[in-house]
Amino acid sequence: MPDHPDNEPILSYAPGSAERAELQAEMDRQMSEVVEIPCVINGEEIFTGNTMTQVIPHKHGHVLANVHLAGPQEMEAACQAAVEAQANWIEMGLEERCAIFEKAADLLSTTWRAKANASTMLNQSKTAFQAEIDAVCELVDFWRFNAYYARQFHDEFQPLHSPEGVINSTEIRPLEGFVLAITPFNFTSISGNLPSAPALVGCTAVWKPSRNSIFSNYVIMKLMMEAGLPPGVINFVPGSGEAITSIALENPHFAGVHFTGSTNTFNGLWERIASALGNLASYPRIVGETGGKDFVVAHPNCDHRALVIALLRGAFEFQGQKCSAASRAYIPRSVWESIKDELVEEVGRITMGDA
């Protein structure tokens, strides 16, 4: 078994650094063109002609891409492609599947690093640091750690014991059918992980990205294809509304949903899946992460300056648009009296827009 992976190192992007210069050049390149983003179904690019624009959130007049939206026909084709691809994908075996995503991690940490970071900065208005820890480091870690632990399914997680005269065996199989991955706008890493984690263990997926992060998500889709992902294993279907989602949820081969988003949306998915059970070949697995609240607890002997920085960054980095953002603080009265003026002053210096 390969050695336990290390976390991907975080680059600083300090002034004068090589990575900063490379990132700036890639941002300039991406801003100089308008990309046509297709659906990707069974490895083929489908330009539907039904388009929406993807703009820079902090500069609405700048168009990054024209997105060709999936309709009912494309969603049905994506579901069928996923079903038809599964047998060969299973036959490939875990080790070869792991190798594809480990190669994707290697590409993301090297030649695709600037591409992923630049697209996330432009598409989701993240800083270089926020993009680096998300689009690169976290997704690299997902792919490497997922592969590492997937290899341990048999030997480590469920060891077998066979008494004399008895032969016990375990066969770990993927779900029969496709997984619908519905991904969020705020983390490129989660968007890449939701379809690829089930794919690693032999499932196939239909990936419906958030309308607000299609540009960066398409970069990740292209990266996985360059790493050797076979056609049909993950099908990329940007679209809108409940109409195309319902087509997947009501497909007899729908086997599961992998979701990150709002609690209300997830509740709605449960209800719609329940109403479609009579049409499904099996009981689908429903896995979801919804909105959370984070907090800061300060010790009476804490470093006051460090606390102020933690409160500012925890609450306001990426505009607080993440479940790990701090929305509550528990601070001893003695500490609060000494930091409140500085904290209020620093909050007043925060500006909105392109820095």
Label for each model-derived stretch:
Residues 1-25, 129-156, 169-172, 260-267, ...:
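C-terminal segments
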Residues 1-64:
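Hydrophobic face of amphipathic alpha-helices that form TPR/SEL1-like repeat modules
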Residues 49, 53-55, 61-154:
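Glycine-rich loop-to-alpha-helix module at the N-terminal edge of alpha/beta enzyme cores
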Residues 61, 97, 202, 234, ...:
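Residue-level signal for inorganic ion chemistry
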Residues 155-231:
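Conserved small-residue-rich beta-alpha loop and adjacent elements
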Residues 168-170, 235-258:
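A structured beta-alpha segment of the ubiquitous adenosine-cofactor-binding alpha/beta core
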Residues 197-199, 248, 278:
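Hydrophobic/aromatic ligand-binding patch that stacks against planar heteroaromatic rings
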Residues 223-228, 250-252, 256, 263-355:
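ALDH superfamily catalytic-core signature
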